[in-house]
Amino acid sequence: MKPIIASHTFLDTFERCPKQAWHKFVAKDLPFVETEAMKWGIRVHDALERRVRDKTPLPEGMGSYEKFAAALDNWPCHVETKLGMTAGGKGTGFFSPNVWCRGKVDVAIPRADACVIIDWKTGKPREDPAELERFAYMIRANNSDLIFFYGRYVWLKEDRLGQEHVLDPDARLAKDKRLMDQVETLQKHGVAWPAHENGLCRNYCDVLACPHNGRK
C-alpha cells in the first residue's frame, strides 16, 4: 500500500477521527465540493501572496487586509513556501520520494536564529498552534540555523491578529510521530480505521455510513 504522507490536514483529521481520515485520504471515496468559502480563501491567499512578494495592490473587496500586508513590507518574507521533510528530520523536496511530511507556509520571516510564521485565515477563529508548530519543524528541517519559533494566525474575517504563540516544534513532532506510528500499524494489519465520535459528526462529516453521522 502506498505510504501516507503526513500533513497538517491529514494529521488533524486522523487525530479527530481515523475513520474519516481513511475515507478522505486513503480510500478517497468522499465527494469533493468546492464551496464559495473555499474559493474565497484561495483568492485571498493568492492576492496576499502577490501583495507581500511583489507589492501588487490587493483587489477590490480585500482592501481591509492591506494593513496586515503592509506590516510585512520591511521584513525578509518567504511567501507560500512549499516544504518537505524526511522521516529522519531532514529537509527534502515537496514531492520527493523520501518525503515524510509536507506543508505550504503562507509567510515565514527568519531573522538570525529565530523565525516568525504568519498564517492567513479566512474562516472562524480557532487558536490552536498545531499547524504553526508543524510548519516550524518543517522549516527547521530545511534551515538548521533556526532555533526559536513564534507564530500568529491572522483572522481576516474578524479583521484582527490572533495571539502570538511561542512554538514547540519538538513536542509537536514527537506527537505527530506517534500518530504516524498508529497509521503505519493500521496499514500494516489491514484493519478498519476506528471511528471517533466528536463534535463535527452530527452535522459536518461526509462519512454517511458511520454510526455517529447525523446527516443520514
Briefly describe each language-model feature range.
Residues 1-3, 19-32, 114-117, 180-191:
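Short amphipathic alpha-helical segments and their helix-coil junctions
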Residues 2-57, 80-81:
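Nuclease catalytic cores
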Residues 5-6, 86-91, 97-98, 127, ...:
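Metal-dependent nuclease catalytic regions and adjoining charged, substrate-binding loops involved
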Residues 13-14, 25-26, 47, 51, ...:
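Residues that form generic nucleotide/phosphate-binding pockets
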Residues 30, 34, 38, 122-126, ...:
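Short, charged/polar micro-motifs that form catalytic or ligand-binding hotspots
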Residues 43-117, 123-130, 141-156, 164-165:
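Catalytic cores of nuclease domains that cleave nucleic-acid phosphodiester backbones
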